[in-house]
Curated annotation (Swiss-Prot):
Family the UniProt entry places it in: Belongs to the PDK/BCKDK protein kinase family.
Protein induction: Up-regulated via the HIF1A signaling pathway in response to hypoxia. Down-regulated in response to prolonged fasting.
UniProt GO molecular function: ATP binding; identical protein binding; protein kinase activity; protein serine/threonine kinase activity; protein-containing complex binding; pyruvate dehydrogenase (acetyl-transferring) kinase activity
Catalytic activity: L-seryl-[pyruvate dehydrogenase E1 alpha subunit] + ATP = O-phospho-L-seryl-[pyruvate dehydrogenase E1 alpha subunit] + ADP + H(+)
Regulation: Activated by binding to the pyruvate dehydrogenase complex subunit DLAT. Strongly activated by NADH plus acetyl-coenzyme A. Inhibited by dichloroacetate.
Tissue: Detected in pancreas islets (at protein level). Expressed predominantly in the heart.
Location in or out of the cell: Mitochondrion matrix
Lineage of the species this protein comes from: Eukaryota, Metazoa, Chordata, Craniata, Vertebrata
Name of the protein in question: [Pyruvate dehydrogenase (acetyl-transferring)] kinase isozyme 1, mitochondrial
Length: 434
């Protein structure tokens, strides 16, 4: 609980600067003496940096920065301001979680990682960008922070599971935790994107097999190739467990440039995460729904590139799910899986937490896309991934801590303003006419 109290400050939120001027205001506040140096300790530092909105970058900006005269000094100057802002914004929201959730060892551990990373970044706020040693040490720090945060997602997930097992879940808490985790994990994806870009571009350990990548971005990401890779790896798991697997039927249509391969500027690992998760779900449903028949319908994938959207539709005949359960598939608090142990980052990611679909949807939404499920109970499910076709429109979707966010945690959610149907029909014979 000490960490929770440490991070809790006042509840008032100052007006946030517009994105274009956020960095300038941050720099000028620091120079004028109203910056974090004049604040006391971690709470003051968090309060100061949380006053500013994160600056969302487009895929084109990521690409242009990394491909045209990539400058480590420029990256240093941007990240030493932007990373504390992103960390502080979400740290303010962590402190608004229920006390019993904040007391769990796993959430305490996550908080300690964020505090340590913020403090390490602030060590560079007054250092010269002209000093080669400073730039080298900063890159080292970025890599260290990235590695420290490897297990943030499963560790926070374990904290939620610990809380649910000890205290149960009421509708209001469930709604607030769902709201928080969507924002927390989206923030984590965005922070990791910045850390990865800097460390891959300037850390000197880029993969030789990915020489055409700009950091983690492939300017010509072959969508079909990533889909096939995800299918093959999911199929291996399916074969191990069920000793069989459904075939893949894949169709592609490039409506934008007919006859050309479907390629977009994207992060292949993000797309892989989404399709791998969807393939696993589709295969499991298909194998179990048709177990008594011994014949397994193929999984059909349609890939279409239009002027605005790249769309991937995956269709299975795994029996589908009822409409009332669709939203639960994206609910972090709903998973009934037994609690797994978080031991090392080499373990199967998120195994047993039931977080595959909600995290996949966040990856899709991160650059203004989406992931949706459409199910026909008794027949099968269509999963559709939407990705922006233009790199200028693929812009980071970032949470910001402001009055609206604060009110969401502090407002008592009122009862629904629609009638709740009773489980049994009313006995109309009990009503007498006067």
């Amino acid at each position: 609980m000490r960490l929770a109290r440490l991070l809790r400050g006042g509840t008032s939120v100052r007006p946030l600067c517009a994105v274009p001027c956020a960095s300038r205001s941050l720099a000028s506040d620091s120079a004028s003496g109203s910056g974090p140096a004049s604040e006391s300790g971690v709470p003051g530092q968090v309060d100061f940096y949380a006053r500013f909105s994160p600056s969302p970058l487009s895929m084109k900006q990521f690409l242009d920065f990394g491909s045209v005269n990539a400058c480590e000094k420029t990256s240093f100057m941007f990240l030493r301001q932007e990373l504390p802002v992103r960390l502080a914004n979400i740290m303010k929201e962590i402190s608004l979680l229920p006390d019993n959730l904040l007391r769990t060892p796993s959430v305490q551990l996550v908080q300690s990682w964020y505090i340590q990373s913020l403090q390490e970044l602030l060590d560079f706020k007054d250092k010269s960008a002209e000093d080669a040693k400073t730039i080298y040490e900063f890159t080292d720090t970025v890599i260290r922070i990235r590695n420290r945060h490897n297990d943030v997602i499963p560790t926070m997930a374990q904290g939620v599971t610990e809380y649910k097992e000890s205290f149960g879940v009421d509708p209001v808490t469930s709604q607030n935790v769902q709201y928080f985790l969507d924002r927390f994990y989206m923030s984590r994806i965005s922070i990791r994107m910045l850390l990865n870009q800097h460390s891959l571009l300037f850390g000197g350990k880029g993969s030789p097999s990915h020489r055409k990548h700009i950091g983690s971005i492939n300017p010509n990401c072959d969508v079909v190739e990533v889909i096939k890779d995800g299918y093959e790896n999911a199929r291996r798991l399916c074969d191990l467990y069920y000793v069989n697997s459904p075939e893949l039927e894949l169709e592609e249509l490039n409506a934008k440039s007919p006859g050309q391969p479907i390629q977009v500027v994207y992060v292949p690992s993000h797309l892989y995460h989404m399709v791998f998760e969807l393939f696993k779900n589709a295969m499991r449903a298909t194998m179990e729904h048709h177990a008594d028949k011994g014949v397994y319908p193929p999984i059909q994938v349609h890939v279409t590139l239009g002027e605005e959207d790249l769309t991937v539709k995956m269709s299975d005949r795994g029996g589908g799910v009822p409409l009332r359960k669709i939203d639960r598939l994206f609910n972090y608090m709903y998973s009934t899986a037994p609690r797994p142990r978080v031991e090392t980052s080499r373990a199967v990611p998120l195994a047993g937490f039931g977080y595959g679909l909600p995290i996949s949807r966040l990856y899709a939404q991160y650059f203004q896309g989406d992931l949706k499920l459409y199910s026909l109970e008794g027949y099968g499910t269509d999963a559709v991934i939407y990705i922006k076709a233009l790199s200028t429109e693929s812009i980071e979707r970032l949470p910001v801590y402001n009055k609206a966010a604060w009110k969401h945690y502090r407002t008592n959610h009122e009862a629904d303003d629609w009638c709740v149907p009773s489980r049994e029909p009313k006995d109309m014979t009990t009503f007498r006419s006067s």
